[in-house]
């Protein structure tokens, strides 16, 4: 993380204790809490009935999120606009579609799924794993250009457990096309570009902490952001609550969430010497413990509102391609179809191939710079000689060379 040396007005994240206190809810007795919960349940149901996405997003961000799985089963498909996919997936299995190239890896990962939750008899777990395999396979066969990545199954298993097998099919398709599309490209380079937003968010909010982290590359956030935190969070109640928030907001907010977690750990990170980057990287790669999920969610929402992507320093947002899911999702009123997502996927794939060709060419030139330089010089001299002879300037030039030679001899 390069230090720009600029000091500007920043949000009050530096006073960690004060900001922590501001996110704590006022103490209420059990009766008041029960009444507030019941009122929130009614409000969520009303928002679902009227398909009020803004109200649902507000409830998903507030303490406790959408509260219960039966509410999530109504709200999540609305947030993900699953109606657009339902007609495309009439059945749970798609044997008529061609086998996807990544299905072997899918099976390996499915066998390692459901590590932390749910706690169920072996027979039930085998059934869940088969459902998970069917679910992933169907979506990949329907959209064969998508590249499976290890950790995708962590995301899908959350959708499966909350929504059930049938409802999860369009939800998985929607989240793949409109939220994690960049992660399903043939290369991880787009995901790395996402990560470089994190130093910019830290820079604009807490330059002191950003300087302390120095030039540490933000790869420490890859596993968490790639899997929407499903790989790292071990409690089902926590990950389902976090998905309330992530599904209600645009994709880039998942990056802001990781930045918010870093900012909340300022004191801990400053205690680690700056000349121990390995220890800093190790600490940053682990989520805070204990995990104050509601607090981190509120911080992330505030960070995003105060410092939207377009305002970030270090040019990080400019490096995100126009066809990235982060940019195409910035318009809250944009109505993209699955066909649009496929088109954008192909455009970004073309960009990746172009970048890779350019990088290979530059690497070749650098590794052969001496021989390439000699050839280039020879070509330049030859071209200059041809130009001089063609213009009839050779006699004049040799005349000047003779004068210079005589002047040097006289001076010596």
Task: Please give the residue ranges for each predicted region.
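N-terminal transition regions in large eukaryotic proteins
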Residues: 1-140, 335-412
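Extended, Lys/Glu/Leu-rich amphipathic alpha-helical scaffolds
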Residues: 31-34, 105, 173-220, 251-340
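Acidic, Ser/Thr-rich intrinsically disordered and amphipathic helical segments
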Residues: 39, 55, 70, 74, ...
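Coil-to-helix interface segments in alpha-helical RNA-associated scaffolds
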Residues: 53, 84-86, 201, 234-239, ...
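Amphipathic alpha-helical segments within well-ordered protein domains
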Residues: 57, 76, 137-140, 156-160, ...
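Active-site-adjacent structural elements in folded domains
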Residues: 120-125, 136-142, 205-215, 223-228
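Extended serine/threonine-enriched, polar tracts that run as long, contiguous segments within proteins
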Residues: 230-235, 244-249
